[in-house]
Design a protein with these regions (language model features):
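Conserved serine/cysteine hydrolase catalytic core
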Residues: 183-243
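Active-site loop/oxyanion-hole signature of alpha/beta-hydrolase fold enzymes
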Residues: 10, 58-96, 270
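The conserved beta1-alpha1 loop
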Residues: 30-32, 98, 225
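Conserved HGGG/HGGXW glycine-rich cap/lid loop of the alpha/beta-hydrolase fold
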Residues: 16-66
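Catalytic histidine-centered segment of alpha/beta-hydrolase-like enzymes
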Residues: 253-266
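Gly/Ala-rich beta-loop-alpha elbow adjacent to hydrolase catalytic centers
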Residues: 97, 101, 105
Length: 284
């Protein structure tokens, strides 16, 4: 899927946007680190009867700008969100954010209050001020070890389908990632669009975002978490965030993990629609 449009972020980075279908109030999807906007089409398919669903690629991802000299701080990610919402120019925008995408939506709302009428965030990476950020260090190290090039898209699909985390997601999401998250090279091989070094920088920059930066927000915000698992786990960040937010509500899902929206899009879509309806006081 090629971009539906492009918009310029504050520093000149080009941000690619995707119209995923539907009409009505806008639902903006903000993807997780290392992924891309277009691969969330299967989630959008459960929402297009209620919303005009739009996704985009953060800088360093998909078809957006991704050179090594770009600033990948999460404040810059929030500026990418702002560029997209300004481009959309819609009266009402609801946000869905996954992991880093959720944190970026929160920062964008902090910077410009009332950007979003409501938000549904799955395991946004926002640390309590007194909690160790070691998990992001581990993720950065792991990202740098990722293989960047493969013989073909079929090779990627075969390899990723047999190992975590992509062996846990619906096949359509993995296919969307392989189609949209890799670029063909002159020799016929394919290469990650979000290169390992850039992904690592983004993970490491996530340590900058703390709860005190966003806890004052009054927007109706659902914070959703999957099951608690051994080791550094973003699910543990959700309850303190939901408790601290003025308009926060916590959703728990014991049957899915950090890639939950890609594992059970129907349940996530159902609860998102219910959350938006309660936030707006309507039956959409």
């Amino acid at each position: 899927m090629g971009p539906s449009w492009n918009v310029e972020s504050n520093d000149g980075s080009q941000i690619a946007g995707y119209e995923l279908g539907g009409s009505g109030e806008v639902l903006l999807i903000a993807h997780a680190t290392g992924l891309c906007g277009a691969m969330y089409q299967l989630l959008a398919d459960h929402l297009t009867d209620r919303f005009r669903v739009v996704a985009f690629d953060f800088r360093g991802h998909g078809d957006s700008s991704g050179s090594s000299d770009i600033d990948y701080g999460w404040d810059r990610m929030a500026e990418d969100v702002a560029a997209v919402t300004e481009h959309l120019g819609a009266e009402t925008i609801h946000g869905f954010g996954h992991s880093m995408g959720g944190a970026a939506l929160l920062l964008a709302e902090r910077n410009v209050p009332s950007t979003f009428a409501s938000m549904f965030l799955f395991e946004p990476i926002v640390f309590p001020d007194d909690v160790s950020k070691e998990g992001q260090n581990v993720m950065g190290l792991a990202a740098r070890r990722r293989r960047a090039e493969f013989d073909s898209r079929a090779d990627v699909l075969y390899r990723y389908a047999g190992r975590p985390p992509f062996n846990q997601v619906r096949a359509g999401f993995l296919a969307g990632y392989v189609d949209n998250g890799f670029a063909e090279q002159p020799d016929g091989r394919v290469r990650l669009k979000c290169l390992p070094e850039i992904e690592a920088q983004i993970f490491e920059n996530g340590r900058q975002i703390e709860l005190s930066a966003v806890q004052h927000l009054t927007t109706p915000i659902a914070v959703a978490v999957g099951r608690d698992e051994p080791g550094p786990n973003p699910a543990r960040l959700g309850p303190p965030l939901a408790d601290a937010l003025v308009g926060g509500t916590l959703f728990r899902y014991d049957h899915i993990g950090h890639f939950g929206p890609l594992q059970d899009p129907w349940t996530i879509a159902r609860d998102l629609v219910d959350h938006v309806a309660k936030a707006s006081g309507s039956n959409i």
